[in-house]
């Protein structure tokens, strides 16, 4: 169930009327695909969608959600408070740059899983909606600074998972390599079988993978319905999936 102000999932509701990034396919895919751990960090949490998905999938986890935007921060607080997972989630209004240098320096805690649906319109003109523009524009979170923070805050055996446009795959992999991170999972996502892959689900680690996990998946079948892979991945979340 969805409306202009919220999106209802099986076990939680996400209101997104106050923040720039609305509930969308990218966030749902990442939240359903990323590996978890005892401690999880959601960078740029927006409405709290991915935070709540990870909390549902990994019931023993402790999750930290951060966002630099005041309205997104407040929206996540409200969405988390309405959920059954509130006791395991902490939310902070801060940038990942500041979080990595100040908060972690004081607490000396690192994360087993870091997730991020990053801003990626690196060279494009900003959209008229300033909040959405800030959420989607890489000026607020350069890839180099993102990877520097991940390198600092992730455990030696942790994973950093993201979803990005295929156009940025090369520069993203290069930046990861500069910060000592190895690509261990790569899922190329096509809307339909005849189209090129527009999105990439990526997972990075500090250790080279024993076996590289690479796959190409299609979101819609020939009739325009969700593919079996997409349905299987999101079955625990979408109301129309059994």
Regions found by a protein language model. Name each.
Residues 194-242:
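SAM/dcSAM-binding transferase cores
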Residues 11, 60, 86-88, 157, ...:
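A generic structural signal for alpha->beta connector loops
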Residues 2-39, 45-56, 203:
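SAM-dependent Rossmann-like transferase core, predominantly class I methyltransferases
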Residues 32-127:
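Conserved SAM/SAH cofactor-binding pocket of Class I
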Residues 19, 141-197:
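Conserved Class I SAM-dependent methyltransferase catalytic core
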Residues 30, 117, 146, 204:
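Residue-level signal for inorganic ion chemistry
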Residues 15, 90-92, 184-187:
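General small-molecule cofactor/ligand-binding pocket signal
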Residues 118-145:
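Mobile active-site "lid"/loop adjacent to the S-adenosyl-L-methionine
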């Amino acid at each position: 169930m969805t409306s202009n102000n919220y999106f209802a999932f099986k076990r939680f509701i996400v209101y997104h009327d106050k923040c720039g990034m609305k509930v969308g396919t990218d966030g749902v895919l990442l939240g359903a695909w990323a590996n978890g751990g005892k401690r999880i960090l959601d960078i740029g949490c927006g409405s709290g969608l991915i935070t709540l998905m990870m909390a549902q999938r990994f019931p023993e986890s402790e999750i930290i959600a951060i966002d630099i935007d005041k309205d997104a921060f407040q929206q996540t607080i409200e969405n988390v408070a309405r959920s059954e997972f509130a006791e395991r989630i902490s939310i902070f209004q801060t940038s990942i740059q500041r979080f990595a240098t100040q908060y972690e320096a004081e607490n000396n805690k690192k994360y087993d899983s870091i997730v991020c649906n990053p801003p990626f319109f690196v060279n494009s003109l900003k959209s008229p909606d300033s909040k959405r523009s800030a959420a989607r524009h890489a000026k607020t979170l350069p890839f180099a600074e993102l990877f520097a923070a991940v390198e600092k805050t992730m455990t030696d055996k942790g994973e950093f998972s993201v979803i990005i446009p295929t156009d940025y795959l090369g520069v993203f992999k290069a930046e990861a390599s500069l910060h000592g991170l190895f690509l261990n999972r790569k899922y190329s996502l096509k809307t339909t079988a005849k189209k090129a892959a527009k999105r990439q689900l990526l997972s990075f680690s500090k250790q080279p993978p024993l076996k590289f996990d690479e796959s190409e998946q299609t979101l819609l079948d020939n009739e325009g319905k969700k593919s079996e892979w997409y349905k299987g991945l999101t079955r625990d979340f979408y109301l129309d999936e059994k």
